[in-house]
From Swiss-Prot:
Gene Ontology CC terms, in alphabetical order: membrane
Entry similarity comment: Belongs to the CDP-alcohol phosphatidyltransferase class-I family.
Location within or outside the cell: Membrane
InterPro entries, A to Z: CDP-OH_P_trans, CDP-OH_PTrfase_TM_dom, CDP_ALCOHOL_P_TRANSF_CS, CHOPT
Biased composition annotated in UniProt, kind: Polar residues: 388-401
Protein name: Uncharacterized CDP-alcohol phosphatidyltransferase class-I family protein 2
Main subcellular location of this protein, as a coarse class: membrane
Species in which this protein is naturally found: Dictyostelium discoideum (Social amoeba)
Length: 409
């Protein structure tokens, strides 16, 4: 059956021989403070523990924080019990810890691989919608602002990997990277736990929570502009027009969901189901692009998953004109089911392809021998540099990066 579900081309499989993953984390919070905590934690991880298990537990933390808000904030406007906000803050802290320890564990056990990178980023992509819902529920800004927050979250994520596809390196900003966002979210949750969520509802139509969302959005826009600028300045790349063409899937997806949210009441009637359906769809689209980047494969401009999305959007457009073909709620559930099935198929068969080719397993790794030679040592040799953890003084532009300062994240 696997021959019918091959998400990586033969060209992509062949290109894995040239794989290396390098990145620069300029995070102020990470380099100045949290780095020491991450290094401390990795001292306690046993050598038999696969990095992907750490990554999976981090995803479970995000699912846990989402379920808390799902139960207590069904319309994204309710006030949850104070303990919920402290619990969410703890789970975010646990997630950011695990999200950084998994890479260190991979280096520690000499088990770095393309599968590990893909697994890590796919879990992060799935978490975008959950973070949007959780933070919006905390700020009590309602479904439409939650939808806006989701779009604000997915674009910087997609563009970061778009830039990496062409630059060959993932660069995270000093004050506008994921670590700073997670720290900000933790602070918001702790403040809400202490003072209650009513502090975010001050104001009439423009509340404190909405103002906070706008400020976060400005940071996201700045990050996106940096991605465009850095990619435009790159030398030895394809023409910038062809680079922009690779954004077709995310542009089409954004246009479709904006139209859908504009013509349908589903976003207010089923806010959690609506946003999570979009989140799983984005996770799939983003994961396909990450796979193509990791394998240096050709980028697809259209995926079959867009067909059911277009059909459901057209169904809602007709319903807004009193032409009812299928109940919008039923159509939403069908799309949710299709999205889950497609994502699971992609995850299973892509993992199988990589494991078969690399001769590795997803959740187990060979115990390293005394010589330190592991089964994935060939990938370690392909890294640009292995340096001791230290503060980074690298700028946000890829032009400023010194190869000796590159490390695997």
């Amino acid at each position: 059956m696997s021959k019918y579900f091959k998400y990586i081309s033969e060209k992509g499989i062949t290109n894995l021989a040239n794989y290396h993953y390098s990145g620069v984390d300029n995070s102020f919070c990470g380099n100045k403070f949290l780095k020491h905590w991450w290094n401390y934690c990795v001292n306690f991880t046993p050598l038999w523990l696969a990095p992907n298990i750490i990554t999976l537990v981090g995803l479970l933390c995000n699912i846990g924080m989402y379920l808390i808000m799902y139960v207590h904030c069904p319309t994204l406007t309710e006030e949850a019990p104070r303990w919920c906000y402290f619990a969410v803050a703890f789970l975010i802290f646990a997630y950011q810890t695990l999200d950084n320890v998994d890479g260190k564990q991979a280096r520690k056990t000499k088990s770095s691989s393309p599968l590990g990178e893909l697994f890590d980023h796919v879990c992060d992509a799935l978490s975008v919608a959950m973070f949007a819902i959780v933070m919006s529920a905390t700020l009590r800004i309602g479904p439409y602002w939650t939808f806006f927050s989701f779009i604000v979250g997915m674009w910087p994520f997609y563009l970061a990997h778009w830039e990496e596809y062409h630059a060959g390196i993932l660069v995270m900003g000093e004050f506008n990277g994921p670590t700073e966002a997670q720290v900000l979210f933790m602070i918001i949750e702790i403040i809400t736990g202490i003072f209650g969520s009513d502090i975010w509802t001050y104001g009439t139509s423009t509340t404190v929570g909405k103002i906070a969302t706008v400020f976060v959005s400005i940071g996201a826009v700045v990050t996106c502009l940096q991605n465009f600028t850095n990619t435009y300045k790159l030398e030895n790349r394809m023409t910038f027009g062809k680079c922009l063409l690779q954004l077709t899937p995310i542009c089409l997806f954004t246009a479709l969901i904006v139209i859908w949210a504009s013509v349908s009441n589903l976003i207010t009637e089923q806010p959690h189901l609506f946003i999570m359906t979009l989140g799983i769809l984005f996770g799939y689209i983003q994961s396909r692009y990450i796979t193509q980047r990791v394998c240096h494969d050709d980028c697809s401009l259209f995926y079959p998953i867009f067909v059911p999305i277009i059909i459901v959007v057209l169904n809602s457009i007709l319903a807004s004109s009193d032409v009812h073909l299928v109940s919008e709620t039923v159509a939403l559930w069908i799309l949710f089911s299709i999205a889950c099935a497609q994502f699971l198929l992609f995850s299973y068969f892509t993992t199988q392809q990589l494991c078969d080719h690399l001769k590795i397993k997803v959740f187990t790794i060979p115990y390293p021998s005394n010589s330190g030679i592991g089964p994935s040592q060939e990938y370690e040799n392909s890294l640009l540099s292995q340096m001791e953890e230290g503060s980074s003084s690298i700028g946000n532009s890829t032009d400023d990066i010194n190869p000796s300062e590159i490390e695997e994240i």
